[in-house]
Amino acid sequence: MNILHSTLSTWRDRLAPVSRTSTFRTTGQITPEEFVLAGDYLVYKFPTWAWADASSPAKRVSYLPPGKQFLVTRGVPCHRRLNENFAGDAGHEDEIVRDMLSGADADDGDGWLRTGGGRDLAEKQAERIKDVRTVDESGNMGEREDDEEDIPDMEDDDDDEEAIIREPAGKSTTQPIRTYNLYITYSNFYRTPRLYLSGYLSPSEPLPPHLMMEDIVGDYKDKTVTLEDFPWFDGGLKMASVHPCRHASVMKTLLDRADAALKIRRDKLKQAHSAAEANRINSERGLEGLVDETRGLSLNEQQGHAAGGDEWEVLQHDEEDQVAIRVDQYLVVFLKFIASVTPGIEHDFTMGV
């Protein structure tokens, strides 16, 4: 059944009519040209990502240029398997999570579905905070910080056999580090990006496909995420793939909320009575802050010229027409959203943001 589904999905993408009309702002979908633009931005801003070609000309799609058939990043670390500490474990109710921009009477469709965790998830947050590590500008993970209260005094415990803390049998959290190659392709049928994942136990030992599901949030397994052949390679290499059927609607919701958050921030800035107050408002980034750090970078020819009074006036004049997320920043936001499906895989390692 999986083979049939994979084959039908591939042919559906290749035979669907190609859209050349941009509906990015109204539908969350992008055209092949916009996918290339967003891919160029991702590669330019985050060099761990690169464009790649199909393994043979017969595997190429006509609506994307040769050499830019898909995007790939390699060797992304995955330090732990998903277990009951992550959302998606069976036996827990689902919960709709809304943000501050949604009213009390908002539709369930306007919120995020926190799968599997339900109310119990809040009780686990304190324990999970201990596993939080920082990411520097280069994308390197920082060391875990020990709780000072848990650090034994070596002078008091010297030669004290009872002071030696031994981990109970079966409770070890040490797990073999896996790595993943991530591939972003364009789905011509859904007109959105699509993510494929290929895992490795070591640089020379591929991870069996069924074991990749250990790194997928439980409620997504075999539903949103399935095992399929990668259409751009010869030989039928099996990968885990995040199905793109809901990508456009989720991205549209993110775009709308980012624009709303940006509008609120602009309104507050207009009412600011001092430079200090304006700086404070600017520091309180909302959803649009996902890409604020990359706002000054663009691959368009209209990139900023030399700084000066004239440029400041132009920015002031055009400010109301700006959007929170541009189409060339699409894949940056897409990867932030897709990370919720595979929280054990360190997606920020590929981006350093």
Curated annotation (Swiss-Prot):
It is found in: Cytoplasm. It holds the Pfam family Autophagy_act_C. Residues 144-156 have a biased composition (Acidic residues). GO terms for biological process: autophagosome assembly; autophagy of mitochondrion; glycophagy; piecemeal microautophagy of the nucleus; protein targeting to membrane; protein transport. Residues 135-156 are annotated as: Disordered. This is Autophagy-related protein 3. The N-terminal region is involved in phosphatidylethanolamine-binding and is required for atg8-PE conjugation. The flexible region (FR) is required for atg7-binding. It comes from the Eukaryota. Keywords: Autophagy, Cytoplasm, Protein transport, Transport, Ubl conjugation pathway. E2 conjugating enzyme required for the cytoplasm to vacuole transport (Cvt) and autophagy. Required for selective autophagic degradation of the nucleus (nucleophagy) as well as for mitophagy which contributes to regulate mitochondrial quantity and quality by eliminating the mitochondria to a basal level to fulfill cellular energy requirements and preventing excess ROS production. Responsible for the E2-like covalent binding of phosphatidylethanolamine to the C-terminal Gly of atg8. Residues 85-167 are annotated as: Flexible region. Belongs to the ATG3 family.
